[in-house]
Curated annotation (Swiss-Prot):
Gene Ontology MF: a single term: ribulose-bisphosphate carboxylase activity
Source organism of this protein record: Euglena stellata
Name of this chain's protein: Ribulose bisphosphate carboxylase large chain
Subunit structure and binding partners: Heterohexadecamer of 8 large chains and 8 small chains.
Similarity comment text for this entry: Belongs to the RuBisCO large chain family. Type I subfamily.
Site (Transition state stabilizer) location in chain: K315
Gene symbol of the encoding locus: rbcL
Protein purpose: RuBisCO catalyzes two reactions: the carboxylation of D-ribulose 1,5-bisphosphate, the primary event in carbon dioxide fixation, as well as the oxidative fragmentation of the pentose substrate in the photorespiration process. Both reactions occur simultaneously and in competition at the same active site.
Annotated binding of substrate, by residue: N104, T154, K158, R276, H308, S360
Keyword Ribonucleoprotein: no
Record's keyword terms, sorted: Calvin cycle, Carbon dioxide fixation, Chloroplast, Lyase, Magnesium, Metal-binding, Monooxygenase, Oxidoreductase, Photorespiration, Photosynthesis, Plastid
PROSITE patterns in UniProt: RUBISCO_LARGE
Miscellaneous section: The basic functional RuBisCO is composed of a large chain homodimer in a 'head-to-tail' conformation. In form I RuBisCO this homodimer is arranged in a barrel-like tetramer with the small subunits forming a tetrameric 'cap' on each end of the 'barrel'.
Amino acid sequence: YRLTYYTPDYQVAETDILAAFRMTPQPGVPAEECGAAVAAESSTGTWTTVWTDGLTQLDRYKGRCYDLEPVPGESNRYIAYIAYPIDLFEEGSVTNLLTSIVGNVFGFKALRALRLEDLRIPPDYAKTFWGPPHGIQAERDRLNKYGRPLLGCTVKPKLGLSAKNYGRAVYECLRGGLDFTKDDENVNSQSVMRWRDRSXFCAEAIYKAQAETGEVKGHYLNATAGTVEEMFKRAVFSAQLGVPIIMHDYITGGFTANTSLSMYCRDNGLLLHIHRAMHAVIDRQRNHGIHFRVLAKTLRMSGGDHLHSGTVVGKLEGEREVTLGFVDLMRDPYVEKDRSRGIYFTQDWCGMGGTMPVASGGIHVWHMPALTEIFGDDACLQFGGGTLGHPWGNRPGAAANRVASEACVQARNEGRDLSREGGDVIREACKWSPEL
Protein backbone atom coordinates (compact mmCIF):
# COMPACT_ATOMS: atom_id res chain seq x y z
CA TYR A 1 0.00 0.00 0.00
CA ARG A 2 2.73 2.47 1.00
CA LEU A 3 4.31 2.67 -2.46
CA THR A 4 1.01 3.53 -4.16
CA TYR A 5 -1.19 5.31 -1.62
CA TYR A 6 1.25 7.23 0.62
CA THR A 7 2.04 10.43 -1.31
CA PRO A 8 3.48 13.14 0.97
CA ASP A 9 4.22 15.41 -2.02
CA TYR A 10 0.59 15.48 -3.18
CA GLN A 11 -0.97 18.93 -3.64
CA VAL A 12 -4.57 18.83 -2.43
CA ALA A 13 -7.13 19.80 -5.09
CA GLU A 14 -9.99 22.18 -4.31
CA THR A 15 -12.46 19.47 -5.27
CA ASP A 16 -10.95 16.76 -3.03
CA ILE A 17 -12.88 15.47 -0.05
CA LEU A 18 -10.44 15.50 2.87
CA ALA A 19 -10.52 13.28 5.95
CA ALA A 20 -8.55 13.46 9.20
CA PHE A 21 -8.21 10.11 10.99
CA ARG A 22 -6.80 9.59 14.49
CA MET A 23 -4.83 6.42 13.83
CA THR A 24 -3.20 3.95 16.25
CA PRO A 25 -1.08 1.35 14.40
CA GLN A 26 -0.39 -2.07 15.85
CA PRO A 27 3.11 -2.34 17.40
CA GLY A 28 5.72 -2.78 14.70
CA VAL A 29 3.52 -1.57 11.84
CA PRO A 30 4.84 1.65 10.21
CA ALA A 31 2.47 4.61 10.33
CA GLU A 32 3.00 5.23 6.60
CA GLU A 33 1.77 1.71 5.82
CA CYS A 34 -1.31 2.14 8.01
CA GLY A 35 -2.19 5.52 6.53
CA ALA A 36 -1.79 4.15 3.02
CA ALA A 37 -3.93 1.12 3.89
CA VAL A 38 -6.76 3.35 5.11
CA ALA A 39 -6.54 5.45 1.94
CA ALA A 40 -6.51 2.35 -0.25
CA GLU A 41 -9.35 0.43 1.35
CA SER A 42 -11.62 3.48 1.47
CA SER A 43 -11.04 4.23 -2.21
CA THR A 44 -9.76 1.91 -4.97
CA GLY A 45 -7.52 -0.63 -3.24
CA THR A 46 -7.87 -4.22 -2.11
CA TRP A 47 -5.52 -6.64 -0.37
CA THR A 48 -3.74 -7.78 -3.55
CA THR A 49 -3.04 -6.67 -7.11
CA VAL A 50 -5.85 -7.59 -9.52
CA TRP A 51 -5.69 -7.68 -13.32
CA THR A 52 -8.47 -5.08 -13.67
CA ASP A 53 -6.10 -2.52 -12.11
CA GLY A 54 -4.71 -2.24 -15.62
CA LEU A 55 -8.11 -1.09 -16.88
CA THR A 56 -8.29 1.74 -14.35
CA GLN A 57 -6.72 5.20 -14.30
CA LEU A 58 -5.48 4.70 -10.76
CA ASP A 59 -3.85 8.11 -10.32
CA ARG A 60 -7.18 9.78 -11.00
CA TYR A 61 -9.33 7.70 -8.66
CA LYS A 62 -7.17 6.55 -5.75
CA GLY A 63 -7.29 8.03 -2.27
CA ARG A 64 -4.01 9.42 -1.00
CA CYS A 65 -2.53 9.66 2.48
CA TYR A 66 -0.77 12.99 2.02
CA ASP A 67 0.29 13.81 5.58
CA LEU A 68 0.98 12.11 8.90
CA GLU A 69 1.11 14.16 12.08
CA PRO A 70 2.12 12.63 15.44
CA VAL A 71 -0.40 13.35 18.20
CA PRO A 72 1.40 15.44 20.86
CA GLY A 73 1.90 13.65 24.16
CA GLU A 74 0.80 10.24 22.87
CA SER A 75 3.08 7.48 21.65
CA ASN A 76 2.39 5.62 18.41
CA ARG A 77 -0.68 7.70 17.57
CA TYR A 78 -1.04 9.88 14.47
CA ILE A 79 -3.43 12.12 12.60
CA ALA A 80 -3.55 10.74 9.05
CA TYR A 81 -4.79 13.16 6.39
CA ILE A 82 -6.36 11.52 3.36
CA ALA A 83 -7.59 13.11 0.13
CA TYR A 84 -10.31 11.48 -1.95
CA PRO A 85 -11.13 12.52 -5.54
CA ILE A 86 -14.69 13.83 -5.79
CA ASP A 87 -15.47 11.32 -8.56
CA LEU A 88 -15.45 8.49 -6.00
CA PHE A 89 -18.73 9.67 -4.45
CA GLU A 90 -22.34 9.78 -5.59
CA GLU A 91 -23.81 13.26 -5.66
CA GLY A 92 -26.23 14.09 -2.85
CA SER A 93 -25.73 10.79 -1.00
CA VAL A 94 -24.53 10.87 2.60
CA THR A 95 -25.06 7.11 2.65
CA ASN A 96 -22.52 6.60 -0.13
CA LEU A 97 -20.07 9.10 1.41
CA LEU A 98 -19.96 7.28 4.74
CA THR A 99 -20.04 3.82 3.20
CA SER A 100 -16.93 4.69 1.20
CA ILE A 101 -14.90 6.51 3.86
CA VAL A 102 -15.72 4.55 7.03
CA GLY A 103 -17.50 1.47 5.74
CA ASN A 104 -14.68 -1.07 5.71
CA VAL A 105 -11.46 0.30 7.22
CA PHE A 106 -12.12 0.13 10.96
CA GLY A 107 -11.50 -3.60 11.27
CA PHE A 108 -8.03 -3.66 9.71
CA LYS A 109 -5.60 -5.96 11.55
CA ALA A 110 -2.80 -3.44 11.09
CA LEU A 111 -4.74 -0.89 13.14
CA ARG A 112 -5.22 -1.01 16.88
CA ALA A 113 -7.73 1.85 16.70
CA LEU A 114 -9.06 4.36 14.18
CA ARG A 115 -11.24 7.42 14.59
CA LEU A 116 -12.56 9.77 11.92
CA GLU A 117 -12.03 13.23 13.41
CA ASP A 118 -13.20 15.53 10.62
CA LEU A 119 -14.19 15.80 6.96
CA ARG A 120 -13.75 18.67 4.52
CA ILE A 121 -16.69 18.79 2.13
CA PRO A 122 -15.57 20.80 -0.93
CA PRO A 123 -17.97 23.36 -2.41
CA ASP A 124 -18.46 21.31 -5.57
CA TYR A 125 -19.75 18.38 -3.51
CA ALA A 126 -21.64 20.44 -0.91
CA LYS A 127 -23.72 21.98 -3.70
CA THR A 128 -25.15 18.54 -4.57
CA PHE A 129 -26.99 18.40 -1.21
CA TRP A 130 -30.24 20.16 -0.34
CA GLY A 131 -29.31 20.55 3.31
CA PRO A 132 -31.88 21.40 6.02
CA PRO A 133 -35.53 21.56 4.90
CA HIS A 134 -35.83 25.23 5.91
CA GLY A 135 -32.88 26.48 7.98
CA ILE A 136 -32.60 28.75 11.00
CA GLN A 137 -33.82 32.03 9.52
CA ALA A 138 -36.81 30.48 7.75
CA GLU A 139 -37.76 28.73 11.00
CA ARG A 140 -37.68 32.00 12.92
CA ASP A 141 -39.82 33.62 10.24
CA ARG A 142 -42.37 30.81 10.45
CA LEU A 143 -42.48 30.96 14.25
CA ASN A 144 -42.26 34.78 14.38
CA LYS A 145 -39.75 34.49 17.23
CA TYR A 146 -36.55 36.50 17.21
CA GLY A 147 -33.76 37.67 19.49
CA ARG A 148 -33.76 34.81 21.99
CA PRO A 149 -33.13 31.06 22.20
CA LEU A 150 -36.13 28.83 21.61
CA LEU A 151 -37.33 26.81 24.61
CA GLY A 152 -38.47 23.21 24.65
CA CYS A 153 -39.28 20.30 26.92
CA THR A 154 -39.24 16.52 26.56
CA VAL A 155 -42.40 14.96 27.98
CA LYS A 156 -41.65 12.58 30.85
CA PRO A 157 -42.13 9.79 31.73
CA LYS A 158 -41.16 8.92 28.19
CA LEU A 159 -43.28 5.74 28.22
CA GLY A 160 -46.36 4.81 30.25
CA LEU A 161 -48.69 7.80 29.73
CA SER A 162 -51.93 7.40 27.82
CA ALA A 163 -52.28 9.52 24.69
CA LYS A 164 -54.80 11.84 26.37
CA ASN A 165 -52.63 12.45 29.44
CA TYR A 166 -49.63 12.90 27.17
CA GLY A 167 -51.50 15.63 25.29
CA ARG A 168 -52.46 17.23 28.59
CA ALA A 169 -48.79 17.40 29.62
CA VAL A 170 -47.94 18.96 26.25
CA TYR A 171 -50.65 21.61 26.66
CA GLU A 172 -49.54 22.59 30.16
CA CYS A 173 -45.93 23.09 29.03
CA LEU A 174 -46.85 25.11 25.94
CA ARG A 175 -49.40 27.19 27.84
CA GLY A 176 -46.77 27.99 30.46
CA GLY A 177 -44.50 29.67 27.92
CA LEU A 178 -42.41 27.07 26.08
CA ASP A 179 -42.12 27.14 22.30
CA PHE A 180 -41.92 23.38 21.81
CA THR A 181 -42.50 20.09 23.51
CA LYS A 182 -40.94 16.84 22.34
CA ASP A 183 -41.49 13.12 22.02
CA ASP A 184 -38.63 11.21 23.57
CA GLU A 185 -36.50 9.34 21.07
CA ASN A 186 -37.97 5.94 21.96
CA VAL A 187 -41.59 7.08 21.75
CA ASN A 188 -42.74 5.55 18.46
CA SER A 189 -46.00 3.57 18.48
CA GLN A 190 -46.04 1.26 21.49
CA SER A 191 -49.16 -0.54 22.68
CA VAL A 192 -49.63 1.89 25.56
CA MET A 193 -49.81 4.88 23.17
CA ARG A 194 -50.24 4.49 19.41
CA TRP A 195 -48.79 7.17 17.18
CA ARG A 196 -52.09 8.30 15.65
CA ASP A 197 -53.73 8.84 19.04
CA ARG A 198 -50.69 10.73 20.32
CA SER A 199 -50.60 12.92 17.21
CA UNK A 200 -54.25 13.86 17.51
CA PHE A 201 -54.10 14.78 21.21
CA CYS A 202 -50.83 16.71 20.75
CA ALA A 203 -52.30 18.69 17.85
CA GLU A 204 -55.29 19.57 20.05
CA ALA A 205 -52.89 20.75 22.76
CA ILE A 206 -50.91 22.85 20.26
CA TYR A 207 -53.97 24.63 18.87
CA LYS A 208 -55.42 25.29 22.32
CA ALA A 209 -52.13 26.74 23.60
CA GLN A 210 -51.72 28.85 20.46
CA ALA A 211 -55.23 30.29 20.82
CA GLU A 212 -54.64 31.22 24.46
CA THR A 213 -51.12 32.66 24.12
CA GLY A 214 -51.14 34.18 20.62
CA GLU A 215 -47.80 32.47 19.91
CA VAL A 216 -46.90 29.75 17.42
CA LYS A 217 -46.33 26.48 19.29
CA GLY A 218 -45.09 23.06 18.25
CA HIS A 219 -44.53 19.49 19.38
CA TYR A 220 -41.87 17.25 17.86
CA LEU A 221 -44.01 14.32 16.72
CA ASN A 222 -41.61 11.41 16.26
CA ALA A 223 -42.08 9.96 12.78
CA THR A 224 -39.35 7.32 13.23
CA ALA A 225 -40.72 3.87 12.41
CA GLY A 226 -39.72 0.34 11.51
CA THR A 227 -40.18 0.94 7.78
CA VAL A 228 -39.80 3.97 5.55
CA GLU A 229 -43.40 3.55 4.39
CA GLU A 230 -44.68 3.74 7.97
CA MET A 231 -42.43 6.74 8.65
CA PHE A 232 -43.97 8.64 5.75
CA LYS A 233 -47.49 7.66 6.86
CA ARG A 234 -46.79 9.38 10.18
CA ALA A 235 -45.21 12.42 8.52
CA VAL A 236 -48.17 12.80 6.14
CA PHE A 237 -50.65 12.60 9.04
CA SER A 238 -48.71 15.32 10.89
CA ALA A 239 -48.84 17.53 7.80
CA GLN A 240 -52.60 16.94 7.52
CA LEU A 241 -53.03 17.99 11.16
CA GLY A 242 -51.23 21.25 10.34
CA VAL A 243 -48.58 20.96 13.06
CA PRO A 244 -45.35 22.89 12.37
CA ILE A 245 -42.66 20.29 13.15
CA ILE A 246 -41.92 16.56 13.27
CA MET A 247 -38.96 14.52 14.50
CA HIS A 248 -36.65 11.74 13.35
CA ASP A 249 -33.95 9.60 15.01
CA TYR A 250 -31.43 9.93 12.20
CA ILE A 251 -28.76 7.42 13.25
CA THR A 252 -31.08 4.55 14.12
CA GLY A 253 -33.44 5.50 11.29
CA GLY A 254 -30.65 5.79 8.73
CA PHE A 255 -29.34 8.53 6.45
CA THR A 256 -31.31 7.41 3.39
CA ALA A 257 -34.59 7.58 5.31
CA ASN A 258 -33.57 10.91 6.85
CA THR A 259 -32.76 12.51 3.50
CA SER A 260 -36.08 11.35 2.05
CA LEU A 261 -37.97 12.67 5.08
CA SER A 262 -36.11 15.98 4.87
CA MET A 263 -37.18 16.42 1.26
CA TYR A 264 -40.79 15.67 2.21
CA CYS A 265 -40.62 18.27 5.00
CA ARG A 266 -39.23 20.86 2.60
CA ASP A 267 -42.02 20.26 0.09
CA ASN A 268 -44.79 20.26 2.71
CA GLY A 269 -43.83 23.07 5.06
CA LEU A 270 -42.77 20.94 8.04
CA LEU A 271 -39.75 21.70 10.20
CA LEU A 272 -37.61 18.65 11.01
CA HIS A 273 -36.17 18.05 14.47
CA ILE A 274 -33.36 15.48 14.59
CA HIS A 275 -32.46 13.36 17.59
CA ARG A 276 -29.05 11.68 17.73
CA ALA A 277 -30.02 8.48 19.57
CA MET A 278 -27.16 5.93 19.49
CA HIS A 279 -24.50 8.56 18.73
CA ALA A 280 -22.39 7.79 21.82
CA VAL A 281 -21.92 4.20 20.63
CA ILE A 282 -20.08 5.70 17.66
CA ASP A 283 -18.44 8.87 18.97
CA ARG A 284 -17.67 8.54 22.68
CA GLN A 285 -14.40 6.58 22.49
CA ARG A 286 -11.51 9.00 22.15
CA ASN A 287 -9.43 6.81 19.85
CA HIS A 288 -11.93 4.72 17.90
CA GLY A 289 -15.12 5.52 16.01
CA ILE A 290 -16.37 8.77 14.46
CA HIS A 291 -16.29 12.17 16.15
CA PHE A 292 -19.69 13.83 16.50
CA ARG A 293 -18.57 16.81 14.40
CA VAL A 294 -18.58 14.45 11.41
CA LEU A 295 -22.05 13.18 12.30
CA ALA A 296 -23.20 16.79 12.66
CA LYS A 297 -21.79 17.77 9.27
CA THR A 298 -23.37 14.81 7.54
CA LEU A 299 -26.72 15.55 9.19
CA ARG A 300 -26.62 19.11 7.89
CA MET A 301 -26.04 17.70 4.41
CA SER A 302 -28.74 15.03 4.78
CA GLY A 303 -31.22 17.55 6.15
CA GLY A 304 -32.45 18.62 9.59
CA ASP A 305 -33.58 21.94 11.07
CA HIS A 306 -32.66 20.98 14.66
CA LEU A 307 -29.98 18.61 15.96
CA HIS A 308 -29.13 17.66 19.54
CA SER A 309 -25.58 18.84 20.19
CA GLY A 310 -24.87 18.48 23.91
CA THR A 311 -25.02 21.14 26.60
CA VAL A 312 -21.48 21.68 27.99
CA VAL A 313 -23.11 22.23 31.42
CA GLY A 314 -25.67 19.42 31.88
CA LYS A 315 -25.55 15.67 32.49
CA LEU A 316 -24.17 14.67 29.06
CA GLU A 317 -20.52 14.76 28.06
CA GLY A 318 -19.09 17.62 25.97
CA GLU A 319 -16.04 19.90 26.15
CA ARG A 320 -16.91 23.56 25.69
CA GLU A 321 -14.56 24.58 22.86
CA VAL A 322 -15.02 21.34 20.93
CA THR A 323 -18.80 21.54 21.32
CA LEU A 324 -18.85 25.14 20.11
CA GLY A 325 -16.69 24.06 17.17
CA PHE A 326 -19.23 21.62 15.79
CA VAL A 327 -22.12 23.91 16.76
CA ASP A 328 -20.58 26.51 14.41
CA LEU A 329 -20.19 23.82 11.74
CA MET A 330 -23.92 23.14 12.08
CA ARG A 331 -25.22 26.68 11.78
CA ASP A 332 -22.61 28.98 10.17
CA PRO A 333 -22.12 29.39 6.41
CA TYR A 334 -18.30 29.43 6.64
CA VAL A 335 -16.01 28.09 9.39
CA GLU A 336 -12.24 28.56 9.50
CA LYS A 337 -9.83 25.81 10.48
CA ASP A 338 -9.16 25.94 14.23
CA ARG A 339 -7.44 22.97 15.82
CA SER A 340 -8.05 24.31 19.33
CA ARG A 341 -11.76 23.70 18.68
CA GLY A 342 -11.20 20.41 16.87
CA ILE A 343 -11.83 21.85 13.40
CA TYR A 344 -9.22 20.29 11.11
CA PHE A 345 -10.35 21.91 7.84
CA THR A 346 -11.88 25.17 6.69
CA GLN A 347 -15.48 24.45 5.70
CA ASP A 348 -17.47 26.51 3.17
CA TRP A 349 -21.13 25.48 3.03
CA CYS A 350 -21.88 27.59 -0.08
CA GLY A 351 -25.11 29.07 1.23
CA MET A 352 -26.55 25.82 2.59
CA GLY A 353 -29.07 26.54 5.35
CA GLY A 354 -28.03 26.13 8.96
CA THR A 355 -29.11 23.51 11.50
CA MET A 356 -30.11 24.84 14.92
CA PRO A 357 -28.26 23.17 17.83
CA VAL A 358 -30.40 21.73 20.61
CA ALA A 359 -29.02 21.73 24.15
CA SER A 360 -30.73 19.00 26.14
CA GLY A 361 -29.87 16.76 29.07
CA GLY A 362 -29.87 17.55 32.78
CA ILE A 363 -30.27 21.33 32.47
CA HIS A 364 -32.47 23.64 34.57
CA VAL A 365 -33.05 27.36 35.21
CA TRP A 366 -29.75 27.87 37.04
CA HIS A 367 -27.96 26.79 33.85
CA MET A 368 -29.80 29.43 31.81
CA PRO A 369 -27.13 32.19 32.09
CA ALA A 370 -24.36 29.82 30.97
CA LEU A 371 -26.48 28.37 28.14
CA THR A 372 -27.41 31.85 26.91
CA GLU A 373 -23.76 32.91 26.95
CA ILE A 374 -22.47 29.71 25.31
CA PHE A 375 -25.04 29.15 22.56
CA GLY A 376 -26.36 32.65 21.87
CA ASP A 377 -29.77 33.17 20.29
CA ASP A 378 -29.72 30.54 17.53
CA ALA A 379 -30.25 27.49 19.71
CA CYS A 380 -33.08 25.51 21.24
CA LEU A 381 -32.75 24.87 24.98
CA GLN A 382 -34.66 21.82 26.15
CA PHE A 383 -35.56 21.30 29.80
CA GLY A 384 -37.22 17.94 30.52
CA GLY A 385 -36.87 17.37 34.24
CA GLY A 386 -36.03 21.08 34.48
CA THR A 387 -39.65 21.82 33.53
CA LEU A 388 -41.67 18.80 34.65
CA GLY A 389 -39.80 18.56 37.96
CA HIS A 390 -41.18 21.89 39.19
CA PRO A 391 -42.96 21.33 42.54
CA TRP A 392 -46.05 23.20 41.28
CA GLY A 393 -46.38 21.28 38.01
CA ASN A 394 -45.68 21.56 34.30
CA ARG A 395 -47.11 25.01 33.59
CA PRO A 396 -45.22 26.79 36.40
CA GLY A 397 -42.09 24.90 35.37
CA ALA A 398 -42.47 26.18 31.81
CA ALA A 399 -43.13 29.71 33.07
CA ALA A 400 -39.99 29.60 35.21
CA ASN A 401 -37.88 28.63 32.20
CA ARG A 402 -39.39 31.38 30.03
CA VAL A 403 -38.85 34.05 32.70
CA ALA A 404 -35.26 32.92 33.31
CA SER A 405 -34.49 32.93 29.58
CA GLU A 406 -35.93 36.39 28.97
CA ALA A 407 -34.14 37.76 32.04
CA CYS A 408 -30.80 36.40 30.80
CA VAL A 409 -31.32 37.74 27.28
CA GLN A 410 -32.21 41.18 28.64
CA ALA A 411 -29.20 41.20 30.96
CA ARG A 412 -26.89 40.18 28.11
CA ASN A 413 -28.34 42.88 25.85
CA GLU A 414 -27.70 45.44 28.61
CA GLY A 415 -24.03 44.45 28.61
CA ARG A 416 -23.94 42.41 31.80
CA ASP A 417 -21.50 39.49 32.06
CA LEU A 418 -23.63 36.37 32.45
CA SER A 419 -20.64 34.21 33.38
CA ARG A 420 -20.10 36.31 36.53
CA GLU A 421 -23.53 37.81 37.21
CA GLY A 422 -25.79 34.99 36.02
CA GLY A 423 -26.84 33.95 39.51
CA ASP A 424 -27.76 37.54 40.40
CA VAL A 425 -29.79 37.86 37.19
CA ILE A 426 -31.85 34.78 38.09
CA ARG A 427 -32.34 35.90 41.70
CA GLU A 428 -33.52 39.34 40.55
CA ALA A 429 -36.02 37.73 38.18
CA CYS A 430 -37.34 35.59 41.04
CA LYS A 431 -38.74 38.74 42.69
CA TRP A 432 -41.24 39.14 39.84
CA SER A 433 -41.99 35.49 39.12
CA PRO A 434 -43.38 33.23 41.85
CA GLU A 435 -42.88 30.22 39.55
CA LEU A 436 -39.15 30.90 39.24
